[in-house]
Amino acid sequence: WLPVVAEQVINGNGNYRERLQHAAATYTAQLLQDDSSALWLIDKQPHNFMHVDLILALFPNARFLYCRRHARDNALSLWMQSFQAGAQDFAYDFTDISAVIQGSRRLVNHWLTRYPDAIRIVQYEHLVSDPVCLLRGVADWLGLPSHDLVSNTPDKDSIISTASLWQARQPIHTRSLRRWEHYSAYVPELLQLPDH
């Protein structure tokens, strides 16, 4: 959606502020289709980090959680996933995966220097190992109450509009930590990525 919204801002009618307001309204309407009474909207598209300037222009109070994962585990997870054609074409070549991971980390670090109050980096390994502790800090940062942050039972009735529906319904686990180590003898390309 963000490329479409960006196009509206660049080529739309009216002055810049009006185009931003129209684009923000269009984007919000799209997100509210599934739950029109939602108080908070979460857009977990993996490439949103490339559009931080645009998102903050549209929604000045937006907050970004960037989940950083061990590069080799991240690469293996991408490489083993079957994506729609054109969606994540870099995910089938470890040189490309490495470039994307390292490039995204550099860009997020840039955004962090520009918008330190709007961005929080969380480590995947900490999230799955101690979700309550990590999420208490996130809730505090967002100004939300921290009670009932993690349920032992995934909410079967909550609306999830994403391809990872099945995964989102599973309990948090640590089975994927350092998973790359089990594959490195068979997929030595993993070793070209940093060990962090």
Where are these regions (language model features)?
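Active-site cores of enzymes that catalyze phosphoryl transfer or operate on phosphate-rich substrates
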Residues: W1-L2, G12
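Conserved phosphate-donor/acceptor-positioning beta-strand/loop module used by diverse small-molecule
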Residues: I55-W79
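Structured core elements
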Residues: L41-D43, R63-R68, I121-Y124
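Conserved nucleotide-binding/hydrolysis micro-motifs of P-loop NTPases
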Residues: W1, R69-N74, L127-V128
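PAPS-dependent sulfotransferases, especially Golgi type II membrane carbohydrate sulfotransferases
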Residues: E7-L39, L78-I121, S129-H196
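Short gly/Ser/Thr-rich phosphate-binding loop of adenylate-forming enzymes
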Residues: V52-I55, H126
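Acidic, metal-coordinating catalytic cores used for nucleic-acid/nucleotide bond scission
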Residues: P46, H126-D130
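Conserved adenosine/adenylate-binding substructure
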Residues: A38-D53
